[in-house]
Amino acid sequence: LVELDRPNAVEDRLRVRPDHLKFLDSLGDSLLLAGPFLNDKGESVGSIVIIESESLDTARAAFNRDPYIEAGLFDMVMVKPWKTVVNRMRA
């Protein structure tokens, strides 16, 4: 899932963030990676969330429960299948 914030969404993002984090936690082991995109000032301007899902429809249904989406935070939301080719992630 790739999401880009609508303009001037910082306050809404901060207000809804605790519920968004609870939502991410509720995804359990299906959640592989999540975090914000940042602008030059270090402010959040979007998000990426990668989950393991049995289908694209199941993934969309899960993401539609995200409080960020329910709050209308994003200008653009894109759900796409993804395949790991190289993984050098470090926590």
Question: Predicted segment positions?
Answer:
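Conserved, structured core segments of small domains
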Residues: 1-91
